[in-house]
Amino acid sequence: MHPTRVWSLAATLFLVVGSMGPRLATGATRPRPRPNPPEETQAAAASPGPSPIEVRFDFEVVERYLSFEEHGGASREELQQWVRLPGNRELLRQGRTEGGLTPEILMEAVRVSLSGQEFHGPAVLGSFTAGKGALLRQLVDTIRSRQGEFAGAAAEALRPYLPVGRQFPPFTVYFHLGGSWDGRTSDAVYINLTLFQARAPQGIAGLDALLVHELFHQAHGYLFPGIDDYSSPQSGLYSLLLRLQQEGIARYLECRYIQRGGAVSDVDRINLDRYLEGLQTAPEHVTDLEAIREALRRNRTLEARHLAGQGFQSGGPLYAIGHRIAESIATVSGQAELARTLSEGPVAFARAYEQSIRSGEAPLFTAAMREDVQALRRGYGREPVRASRLRREGLALIGSQEL
């Protein structure tokens, strides 16, 4: 859910992780064409060229685990090397954030699993299911054989929303084992194959759409810095709007991708129904948005952060609000206007939405929210990265003087 450029501002700026938790899903998948809608076909025809992004798949975490299984176990040294693989970074990062998962516990999970038992660890880890090495091998081989197809489909879905000629570094997709999510994005994209393994025999159904969602986050992270700063009312509102933009557009793109493909799997149908229902029910959750805004206005920033976390947890109602905002902008003002907001930020996203509200439509922003967005545009929103850095440095100075 956020940028991949690292801003070392100690818990003020960070790489946003874009995940909705495990998508509800079962069902088989098969290769299918993804025809673009007319306006996107015209845009692609007008500006042909190489893929806008290069995607690399990394299976080392899973391959080494399968090697351990084939050899009947692993030494402590081998497990220590395995746990330090780049593909395990996000799992361990979330383990530190949520608590309960350390490298030692992850190594123990592998050891127990290799002995033929199921390891029940902290919630952030999920579970390691033993005795399914053949299925895991099948998943890896299938994904590997289709990685060009998956990467190409995601790149074409993102093409209309990326600046023409913009150069991106290669994007890496790491496949790992364990976690309470299907996909997350921070410095790279991390896909949890344990959940796909648990869907057997449906396999990799839904992976292509998930990659569209997560690779969008990766690309957006290079276009605009990620900020999660609830240290002041304005920085908190900015952070809230940015998360709405990130998750809203990611879901919008994923939803359109599924619709264009005809929702051929049960996974696609379940997710599509969920997303479309969210579009319809989003106005019912304006009160959730207002509760966060009101907490910020009263300078109850910790409460606001907590409420926002609840609203986004596991694809919660704030995803649907962001999706509806993105849908409204694209429908009324066009996809070019929605794409413009990616480089200009969340205040531009909010303003574009206000200009796209149709007559008779119940707006998702109250008058008070619109007023606060205007104030944000005049204040913190002008230089958000600098403002957060200066505030952090100022608070650190005050703290040192108090000591």
Which residues does each PLM region occupy?
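Acidic/His-rich structured neighborhood in mature extracellular/periplasmic domains
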Residues: S115-L272
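Bacterial N-terminal signal peptides
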Residues: A10-G21
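Structured segments of extracytoplasmic/periplasmic soluble domains
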Residues: R64-G72, W82-R89, P160-Y161, Q218, ...
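Post-HExxH zinc-binding segment in Zn-dependent metallohydrolases
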Residues: P48-E78, L223-I292, S359-L364, A368
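N-terminal mature-domain "stem" immediately C-terminal to a signal peptide or N-terminal signal-anchor/transmembrane
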Residues: R30-H120, A362-G379, V385-G399
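Boundary at the C-terminal end of the N-terminal hydrophobic targeting segment
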Residues: P22-G27
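Bacterial N-terminal signal peptides that target proteins for export
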Residues: M1-A10
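Pan-zinc metallopeptidase signature
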Residues: N271-L403
